[in-house]
Amino acid sequence: MKFYITTPIYYVNSEPHIGSAYTTIVADIIARYKRFMGYDVFFLTGTDEHGQKVLQAAQQAGKDPQEFCDELAEKFKRLWKELKITNDYFIRTTDEMHMKTVQEFVAKMKENGDVYKGIYKGWYCVPCETFWNEDEVIKEGEERFCPECKRPVKWVEEENYFFRLSKYRDSLLKYYEEHPDFVEPDFRRNEMLKILEGGLKDLSITRTTFKWGVPMKDDPEHVIYVWVDALINYISAIGYGWNDEMFNKWWPADLHLIGKEINRFHSIIWPAMLMSVGLPLPKKVFAHGWLTVNGQKISKSLGNAIDPRFFVKRYGNDVVRYYLIRDIMFGKDGDFSEERLVHRLNSDLANDYGNLLHRITAMIKKYFNGRLPSPSAQEGFDSWLKERFFETKDAYHELMDSYRLTEALDKIWEFIADVNKYFNDTKPWILGKEGNMERLGTVLYNSLEAVFKVALMTLPVMPDTSEEVFRRVSFEEKPSKEHLENWGVLKPGSTVIHGEPLFKKIDAKDFKKVVETVSAEQNAITIDDFSKVDLRIAKVLEAEKVPNSRKLLRLIIDLGTEKRQIVAGIAEHYRPEELVGKLIVVVANLKPAKLMGIESQGMLLAAKSGDTLRLLTVDGEITPGAKVS
């Protein structure tokens, strides 16, 4: 049995955050589960390193794009290692093997009559690397915004190669009808069906305005569209075009795991590309929801990107993994909350699970000198516990096989509650006091066997914790499905280690300290970082509204040695006449940018709370151009 699972490859315009870690952790859990069940698994992840957005990020960092990509790819690799991700391969789209595969794949599409040259006229979102038609963008007066990221799009007119995507609309609809489980969850499938039923337009698949990408094989002035380049990673990594035996073993993929915002690329464009070259389609695309912070999508531009390493350092890798899966229903949007994480740690892990093991091993140490007792004649309550285990085990397999990970953990914790009930209701402490060692031994054996089963079922989610449980019960074999299928795996007479509690609870005072420390560490910058920002006092000489914009004002400011123009989104908070004569704080060494076609030569500073915005100013007269330090 084989199982090929992929994550999206992550864009290297910025460092990894908790959102990208979430997808990769989910994939790792599924991969670990499949290995546990006896599958031969290939788990692929990697980085998407071409495109205009990466080029711009490299330029802003003052680095060569390859050097920039090398550094960020290493950061992703290091993070996955810290999170104990068990991927089998890490692909980079700048790999020579991948780039050659992309060229050959697109050449084959062209040979099959599905690629032609034309003129593209339309909107383009650089942050999303996505083309949009006029009827798809968000309109605010003369401004146009990306329907996905809500940032401004730019009008593009250039000679491109196009993919005949429209040709495959009917074939895709038929495939969706014949394979109702192709895209999950159902509501994501319905979104894709709605797009297909509305008709498809041919897709521009090359760019000529920059060179950071894979050149067309027979027309190197054209760089292949970054999304076409990226999607092909799923087959280039497993041998397409260079290792037929490997490719035939693993393709088609069993599961493409993605975020909902890139569903259209994976569930419409990618299948059409595969149809074009005659390859089978992946078995399933699962589009999960967004991980949000305070209700907002995680984004570097919003300043709410969370570095998962801080939480792993504070709470442990297994705690973070457990929280993300248990608290966020897989497939739907979920909000990351450190307070909820601590609640799950204290309640689910420390109280329900860890304390149960601690109580059992303490009694084995006290009454049986740390040796696992032999079970004897079974009573009704013993049979009930076993029945509950087998019911849980069967439900666990069904839920894990259908990627209902949150529900699988719910079932396990229902069983933990059952084990706690069994332990409490059989009252082993009374059995010990009464000297009923035979019955006590049976209760403690069954209780520890049940906790061992919990460790087996949670092994994909909390590998370190499960390994620690195995160590404490002297289980030295490689864990497998067979150990979960049968009751009575633990060997009587084996050493049972009592040890420290599996999880350390966090009280309210400690939680406050952790939050303050983590916040300080995540936001900390060096004095060298701060010194790079040139903050100056400027005097506003003129102010006016930008035509056709309800948000923007154009300011002429005096910086002492020169006058500059700044465009700022403060029109909803200040009238132009209110600003003239004010002394404000500006970033003077910011790279100029165009807003609504007007060049902004700096950025003013303001504070915002809810709907209130106020400019940063000074409490008295000072010469324009004075440096803020």
From Swiss-Prot:
SUPFAM superfamilies: Anticodon-binding domain of a subclass of class I aminoacyl-tRNA synthetases, Nucleic acid-binding proteins, Nucleotidylyl transferase. GO terms for molecular function: ATP binding; metal ion binding; methionine-tRNA ligase activity; tRNA binding. PROSITE patterns: TRBD. InterPro entries: Anticodon_Met (IPR041872), M/V/L/I-tRNA-synth_anticd-bd (IPR013155), Met-tRNA-synth_bsu_C (IPR004495), Met-tRNA_synth (IPR014758), Met-tRNA_synth_2 (IPR023457), Methionyl/Leucyl_tRNA_Synth (IPR015413), MetRS_core (IPR033911), NA-bd_OB-fold (IPR012340). A motif ('KMSKS' region) lies at residues 297-301. It is found in: Cytoplasm. It is an enzyme of class 6 (ligase). Its cofactor is Zn(2+). One of its GO terms (cellular component) is cytoplasm. Zn(2+) binds at residues 125, 128, 146, 149. Its main location: cytoplasm. A motif ('HIGH' region) lies at residues 10-20. One of its GO terms (biological process) is methionyl-tRNA aminoacylation. Gene3D superfamilies: 2.170.220.10, HUPs, Isoleucyl-tRNA Synthetase, Domain 1, Nucleic acid-binding proteins. Pfam families: Anticodon_1, tRNA-synt_1g, tRNA_bind. Binds 1 zinc ion per subunit. Homodimer. Is required not only for elongation of protein synthesis but also for the initiation of all mRNA translation through initiator tRNA(fMet) aminoacylation. PANTHER family: METHIONINE--TRNA LIGASE, MITOCHONDRIAL, METHIONYL-TRNA SYNTHETASE. Belongs to the class-I aminoacyl-tRNA synthetase family. MetG type 2A subfamily. This is Methionine--tRNA ligase.
